[in-house]
């Protein structure tokens, strides 16, 4: 098969092509985005960062090292929830092609073939055009240096011209020697499995839309254990402020913290085999804003662990162990409970999908 003959194909982008793509991405019309990519196949859009990098429009079947099944798995297995993803194209770095995808939520992601990990890039395509790819070590770990004349704005070039000028290599020579880091992948898959298991455990609690709802749920389930797949604490035993042993002075300390921070509802105490008495176990609280707080009887301080219950489950005790990139995914709202905890936007039960 003559691979080089396939390097340039598709229509020539006109001056309105970028505006059209921005409009399609803003509406999250994935079928039309896919049609756009097919129409301008093997044309490249310059991006501001990293320098000299281009987004090459290409369908899934033409990305070396990938199969259709791999792209289908990214819709669900990588995030713990279902969000249909559409391939925009690839960014070429030395000897590798990095897929850039857009989700139904309008967010932009990239996939690392070596670790089989999906990373969050930015909230929408407009940000991608303005800033490029920042904050990931997959493409670069350096910060951009903005200089006059360094970047002339987004423009289209054919893959053929970029190859003739030695800017890009033939995409069919890329990803050939990239090997799966199996040890890293197994660790990430284990974290992913634990994360999804915790979503199932806390799904009922996540449906509470107010502090009153949370209080009623906890009071009806006092003593119930919710499993935490975290290195330090293994479970949360639900309990009200009255049922969790505090003592008068310690309860007063908690009220003082509420005056300084915000009103909270006690969810229960955190369990680990090292704690011999309930009296010394730290407790977990949720605030009116939906933020999750940790409170122990040594420091007597409410410490924020996450902006919402979902963030707490995803990141966990980030000070104590690596969270393997889950903080890069962004706030998940399409998969977790009827309401994505306090302070989050409404989601619908029909969007839920408990997959592997």
From Swiss-Prot:
Q: Which domain of life is it from?
A: Viruses
Family under the similarity heading: Belongs to the herpesviridae US22 family.
- Name under which the protein is recorded: Protein U8
Its ancestry begins with: Viruses, Duplodnaviria, Heunggongvirae, Peploviricota, Herviviricetes
What is the name of the gene encoding this protein? U8
């Amino acid at each position: 098969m003559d691979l080089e003959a396939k390097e340039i194909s598709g229509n020539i982008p006109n001056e309105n092509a970028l505006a059209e793509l921005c409009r399609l991405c803003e509406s999250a019309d994935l079928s039309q985005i896919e049609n756009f990519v097919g129409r301008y196949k093997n044309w490249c859009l310059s991006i501001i960062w990293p320098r000299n990098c281009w987004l090459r429009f290409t369908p899934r079947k033409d990305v070396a090292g990938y199969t259709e099944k791999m792209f289908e798995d990214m819709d669900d297995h990588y995030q713990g929830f279902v969000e249909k993803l559409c391939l925009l194209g690839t960014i070429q770095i030395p000897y590798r092609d990095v897929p850039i995808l857009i989700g139904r939520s309008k967010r932009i992601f990239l996939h690392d073939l070596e670790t089989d990990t999906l990373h969050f890039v930015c909230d929408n395509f407009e940000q991608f055009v303005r800033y490029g790819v920042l904050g990931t070590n997959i493409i670069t770990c350096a910060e951009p240096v903005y200089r006059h004349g360094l970047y002339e704005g987004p423009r289209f070039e054919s893959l053929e011209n970029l190859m003739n000028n030695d800017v890009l290599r033939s995409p069919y020579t890329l990803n050939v020697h990239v090997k799966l880091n199996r040890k890293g992948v197994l660790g990430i898959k284990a974290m992913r499995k634990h994360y999804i298991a915790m979503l199932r455990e806390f799904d009922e609690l996540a449906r509470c839309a107010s502090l009153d709802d949370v209080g009623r749920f906890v009071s009806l389930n006092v003593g119930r254990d919710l499993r935490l797949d975290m290195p330090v604490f293994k479970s949360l035993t639900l309990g009200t402020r009255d049922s969790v042993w505090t003592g008068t002075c310690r309860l007063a300390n908690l009220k003082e913290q509420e005056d300084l921070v915000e009103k909270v509802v006690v969810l229960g105490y955190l369990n680990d085999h090292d704690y011999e008495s309930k009296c010394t176990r730290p407790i977990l609280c949720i605030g009116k804003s939906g933020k999750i707080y940790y409170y122990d009887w040594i420091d007597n301080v409410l410490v924020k662990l996450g902006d919402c219950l979902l963030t707490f489950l995803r990141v966990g005790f980030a000070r104590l162990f690596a969270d393997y990139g889950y903080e890069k995914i962004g706030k998940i709202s399409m998969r977790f409970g009827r309401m994505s905890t306090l302070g989050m936007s409404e989601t619908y039960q029909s969007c839920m999908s408990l997959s592997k």
